[in-house]
From Swiss-Prot:
Expressed by the venom gland. The active site is at E334. CDD domains: ZnMc_adamalysin_II_like. Residues 197-393 form the Peptidase M12B domain. This is Snake venom metalloproteinase atrolysin-C. It catalyses: Cleavage of 5-His-|-Leu-6, 10-His-|-Leu-11, 14-Ala-|-Leu-15, 16-Tyr-|-Leu-17 and 23-Gly-|-Phe-24 of insulin B chain. With small molecule substrates prefers hydrophobic residue at P2' and small residue such as Ala, Gly at P1. Snake venom zinc metalloproteinase that causes hemorrhage by provoking the degradation of the sub-endothelial matrix proteins (fibronectin, laminin, type IV collagen, nidogen, and gelatins). Monomer. Residues 1-20 form the signal peptide.
């Protein structure tokens, strides 16, 4: 018989209904303080890894016990994941950090078939989960008790700006036949049998983003990893695995002319991607994260139906919110345009969830792709047969102990 050791952390829950607190996600006016209890079954004497492949947490939400099951997102990084930044004199510095033992998870709530979760466990639990159709955010509290976390609804984060924020889209392809309303087709992901596809994504953070986060590469790295973990979760409903293959940070200066005129910035980014980035890093799509305020209340811009195009498989996204979930929705939206998805109606709902391809971003109970978006995507696959998203970006398992720095000896090396 295998003996197991139950590792438990924390016990209590203290709701502060009606209180207000400033968190990393913003000023929250209604939240609960919770102490998640971690339960891990390990063989007796086993060495506990820093980040386990599977974890289970117990906590209370609205006074009710909840069991959160988490599984490490092993699709999050491609086999050749790299990071690039620039020295003060402009030299490219590229590394291949080991990401095998990363701290990003996806999951579900026990006994809730419609639940989802995307969580970072790098420093406490941070992310979101959907429980009984409601979206909750969780993040650590900076208290003397290091196990304290805040749980709150997205709607309880105070709005910084009431002005409507919109997405731009450039028309770069035409349909050969009129699209039927997906509502008439009564489609869902299971019925459509959407084929498995894989997107190797590059995220580029401009110099304003670098300065916004106090020139801290680690802060930007963590933010982008959390955003892509959310994107990966959204696209699972379409049978698409989104893996981050490169993070580039323009730490010295911008490599293109970044302007508020979003279309000009998009065009400049397209030229740079084709003539520079693609020559040194194989990838399927690149998204520019910029801290400049784009024109006409635009949060992002992307060409329509351009996935796998060597120049136009791109998008730009304004770093508009401290809430990584909303940034994930925005970047997933722009990526959707690259996959042929047009805008949904401004009031589009999928059940109780807001549609990701709405033209404007608003806070909702949860976010999903609509049936129309699924049909647009399926039509794009049939008409254009994009080849770059067919290959699966498998992880390479190291076969030896680490050597100096982050380098690993791979199979065949000496």
């Amino acid at each position: 018989m295998i003996e197991v050791v139950l590792v438990t952390i924390c016990l209590a829950v203290f709701p502060y209904q009606g209180s207000s607190i400033i968190l990393e996600s913003g000023n929250v006016n209604d939240y609960e303080v919770v102490y998640p209890r971690k339960v891990t079954a390990l063989p007796k004497g086993a060495v506990q890894p820093k980040y386990e492949d599977a974890m289970q947490y117990e906590l209370k939400v609205n006074g009710e016990p909840v069991v959160l099951h988490l599984e490490k997102n092993k699709e999050l990084f491609s086999k050749d994941y790299s990071e690039t930044h620039y020295s003060p004199d402009g030299r490219k510095i590229t590394t291949n950090p080991s990401v095998e033992d990363h701290c990003y998870y996806r999951g579900r709530i026990e006994n809730d078939a419609d639940s989802t979760a995307s969580i970072s466990a790098c420093n406490g639990l941070k992310g979101h989960f959907k429980l009984q159709g409601e979206l909750y955010l969780i993040e650590p509290l900076e208290l003397s008790d290091s196990e304290a976390h805040a749980v709150f609804k997205l709607e309880n984060v105070e709005k910084e700006d009431e002005a409507p924020k919109m997405c731009g889209v450039t028309q770069n392809w035409e349909s050969y036949e009129p699209i039927k309303k997906a509502s008439d087709l009564n489609l869902n992901p299971d019925q459509q049998n959407l084929p498995q596809r894989y997107i190797e994504l590059v995220v580029v953070a401009d110099h304003r983003v670098f300065m916004k986060y106090n020139s801290d590469l680690n802060t930007i790295r963590t933010r982008v990893h959390e955003i892509v973990n959310f994107i990966n979760g959204f696209y699972r409903s379409l049978n698409i695995h989104v893996s981050l293959t490169d993070l580039e940070i323009w730490s010295n200066e911008d490599q293109i002319n970044i302007q508020s005129a979003s279309s000009d910035t998009l065009n400049a980014f397209a030229e740079w991607r084709e003539t520079d980035l693609l020559n040194r890093k194989s990838h399927d799509n690149a998204q520019l994260l910029t801290a400049i305020e784009l024109d006409e209340e635009t949060l992002g811009l992307a060409p329509l139906g351009t996935m796998c195009d060597p120049k136009l498989s791109i998008g730009i996204v304004q770093d508009h919110s401290p809430i990584n979930l909303l940034m994930g929705v925005t970047m997933a939206h722009e990526l959707g345009h690259n996959l042929g998805m047009e805008h949904d109606g401004k009031d589009c709902l999928r059940g109780a969830s807001l549609c990701i391809m709405r033209p404007g971003l608003t806070k909702g109970r949860s976010y999903e792709f609509s049936a129309d978006s699924m049909h647009y995507y399926e039509r794009f696959l049939k008409q254009y047969k994009p080849q770059c998203i067919l290959n699966k970006p498998l992880r390479i398992d190291p076969v030896s102990t680490p050597v100096s720095g982050n380098e690993l000896l791979e199979a065949g090396e000496e």
